[in-house]
Amino acid sequence: MRLTIAAAAAALALCLPAQTFAQDAAKGETVFKKCQICHEVGPTAKVKVGPILNDVVGRKAGTLPGFAYSPAMKEAGEKGLAWTDESISKYLENPRDFVPKNKMAFVGLKKEDERADVIAYLKKYTAPK
């Protein structure tokens, strides 16, 4: 009986649309305040503890000139990691799990909607390609 209920629940879950979050750049700007200790965006952005995040969306990981990336982040980029909405979200959820041995000490953003909002905010500082 339990197996039947579990199977029915799994089948129902597959039929339902995946939850998606609308990206809100204004909310993302608020959430990004957690990131500003180490990162900057905008026309006057400078390298701090972390790299500048202008044009991060679409960039190959570990390649911003003027920032000393960890060997792990450089290797991730060399193996093909590029910063897409999906990869940024996974990285922000748990940076140490996504790229082990990277320098980012941030514990992560656990809420998917906050990650989506930060990505929308970062896109404001990403030039169209």
Spans of features found by a protein language model:
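C-terminal capping alpha-helices of c-type cytochrome domains
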Residues: 82-129
